[in-house]
Amino acid sequence: MNWHKLLHNAWNSFLKKKKNNGEVIMPYLNSFAENYKTRLAVIERHLQRKDYNFGKWKAILIPKKDGGNRPLIIPNSISDKLVLKSISDYLSDSLCHLFNSVSSISYAYQKGKCTRDALVQLKRIHNPENILLKIDIKHFFDEIDKIILIQLLDQYQIDDYVKHLIYKGINPVIDYSNLKKK
């Protein structure tokens, strides 16, 4: 595992996303950025020693278009966000052969693909005899069986420690004390 490269790529992506969204850089982010190389080295050491621990995550509610609220569980720390992004990039690279097998029909959660690509493909294959079905499965991610997910990962050559981190990441310690509408 090249945690060094994964973490630096995650940091660059994280910082670029914050800047592109026009977000005000918050003090905690400035603090991290001032000595990011040292902070990334500390995270990397924990990952290499296989003793990285996620911190508490926070629960928040975000408004939905229909007037309701969608609960989100998000990491509090930049470190946790960078480790998760590193894992995501590692999985994308490790499982790209699976994505390639459905590349002409699947557009979700894949590097280099976006909603526009899906719409272009849809326009290309659309004819009056086809039916377009748009669905939203309520609580989809809540219904994923986490044990089955981990068992599926066992079928592929995924680093065992990464699987351990994934398990910890899908079963975080959650702080509900500040649950409020955002």
In which residue ranges do the predicted regions lie?
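Generic hydrophobic/packing signal
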Residues: D66, I78, L91-L95, H126, ...
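Short, hydrophobic/amphipathic alpha-helical patches that form generic packing surfaces
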Residues: N12-S13, K85-D89, K168
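Active-site-proximal segment of RNA-dependent polymerases
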Residues: L84, S88-K146
